[in-house]
Every structure is written in C-alpha cells, then in structure tokens.
Amino acid sequence: MMNLILAFSGVIALYGGYLYLRLRQSQKQAATLQKEKEQLQTQKTVAETKVKNYQVKQKNEENLISRSRTSLLERMHNDGDLRD
C-alpha cells in the first residue's frame, strides 16, 4: 500500500513538473509573440507615415504644377502672347 502511495505521489509530481515546464514555455512564446507584435506595429506605423508623406508630396507637386501653369498663362495674357 505504501509503494502505491509513493508511486502515485511520484506520478503527480512528474505531472506537476510537466505542467510547470509547459507553462514556462507558453510564457516564453507569449513574450516572443508580443515582441514581434510590437515590432510589426512599429513597421506598420513607419509604412503608414511613408505613404502619407508621399501623398502630401504628390499633392504639393500637383499644386506647384497647376500654380506654375496658372502664373504662366497670366504672364502670357499680360504680355499679349496668349490667344483668346
């Protein structure tokens, strides 16, 4: 009877150790995934900023082109070089 109790206690201790190791492994995996998530979030923010900057640049270039065209037409009209 005593051997049975010791064997059962050993099995419970081994199972407890196994659960502890699995818990530690899960915690490490969760920490790794959290780091990866933060890194991806940073990359996403950088990419969104680049896209926004490019869109602003495009808009500024379009405004510059239309402004240049408008000022050119006004100068030609004032100089009498523009046909109506």
From Swiss-Prot:
Domain of life of the native organism: Bacteria
The keyword Transmembrane is assigned to this record: yes
Alphabetical list of Pfam families matching this protein: DUF2681
Chief location bin: membrane
Transmembrane segments: 7-23
Lipid bilayer topology: Single-pass membrane protein
GO cellular component, one term: membrane
Keywords associated with the record: Membrane, Transmembrane, Transmembrane helix
Subcellular location: Membrane
Protein name (Swiss-Prot/TrEMBL): Uncharacterized protein HI_1496
